[in-house]
Amino acid sequence: MKYARVIGTGSYLPEKILTNHDLERMVDTSDEWIRTRTGIAQRHIAADSEMASDLALNASREAIKAGGIDAREIELVIVATTTPDMIFPSTACILQDKLGIGDCAAFDVQAVCSGFIYALATADMFIRAGKCQTALVVGAEVYSRILDWSDRSTCVLFGDGAGAVLLTGDERPGVLSTHLHADGSQSKILSAPANICGGKVQGKPFVVMEGNTVFKFAVKVLEEVVHEALTENNLESSDIDWLIPHQANIRIIASTAKKLGIPMDKVVATVDKHGNTSAASIPLALDIAARDGRIKSGQHVLLEGVGGGFTWGAALIRW
């Protein structure tokens, strides 16, 4: 049986840092209020000249370098993003060109904050089916472009960044299973309800969110999908060495870990320094934990995320 194994990770954060104290001068909020409710202290903001593909390019180069391969060996590029460079072509196609990769499949996946899990699952299925040997999976966001910077309930939450993983087919277990779900009836609780018609933006092109509803729904479905992954692999929560959740806010992260019986010292949390980077948050956190030596060969790593749509999912990996 062929598995998809992670052979390299990479990440990139824009140079500009926006702290809670900076936000105090922009909207009616405080560092104490933001930290208490979200756990966020700062977030990175892309320069005006930086697009999602630029962030993705930097993260991808790091992953390719870590994987020790030539970029031209990549046969599949998937980018998870809510903030693409343009309407079309896909950010994945733009990234493919910037990497100098020749003819290979390239496309975007849009599942908001669950996007990386969806993209990883798709690449895993390609490799398991024998349709490709090496795949690049990226989560990249310039979420600052779709924020209403006068709305203190949302602008304090998000940041920009990118994370990437390089996968290759192997007989040794890597990605053990992936689990994807969606419930379109909950689409209105987290959205950016706008479209383009006749060259004009129709509706509100900024993030709107029913915070309490999102919190309750997220904790419920994340617990369920994690148990689904554990059951399929005949594991208990105590068998998980590292939980790497979507970095929405520390309350969702801590509540989910508590329900699962996973201590916080087994949870990789970067939300304090990155904020919520949507589809980029999981691969960003994964890269940091891989590079600082926390994740070791043979360990079980559980990724989980939830996002607008409403979408959610999990992936269980043997490192």
UniProtKB/Swiss-Prot annotation:
The keyword Transcription does not apply. Its EC number is 2.3.1.180. Residues 247-251 are annotated as: ACP-binding. CDD domains: KAS_III. It comes from the Bacteria. The keyword 4Fe-4S does not apply. Pathway: Lipid metabolism; fatty acid biosynthesis. One of its GO terms (molecular function) is 3-oxoacyl-[acyl-carrier-protein] synthase activity. Keywords: Acyltransferase, Cytoplasm, Fatty acid biosynthesis, Fatty acid metabolism, Lipid biosynthesis, Lipid metabolism, Multifunctional enzyme, Transferase. Gene3D superfamilies: 3.40.47.10. One of its GO terms (cellular component) is cytoplasm. Coiled coil: none annotated. GO terms for biological process: fatty acid biosynthetic process. The active site is at residues 113, 246, 276. The last Arg residue of the ACP-binding site is essential for the weak association between ACP/AcpP and FabH. Homodimer. HAMAP family: FabH (MF_01815). Catalyzes the condensation reaction of fatty acid synthesis by the addition to an acyl acceptor of two carbons from malonyl-ACP. Catalyzes the first condensation reaction which initiates fatty acid synthesis and may therefore play a role in governing the total rate of fatty acid production. Possesses both acetoacetyl-ACP synthase and acetyl transacylase activities. Its substrate specificity determines the biosynthesis of branched-chain and/or straight-chain of fatty acids. Belongs to the thiolase-like superfamily. FabH family. This is Beta-ketoacyl-[acyl-carrier-protein] synthase III. The lineage of its organism: Bacteria, Pseudomonadati, Pseudomonadota, Betaproteobacteria, Nitrosomonadales.
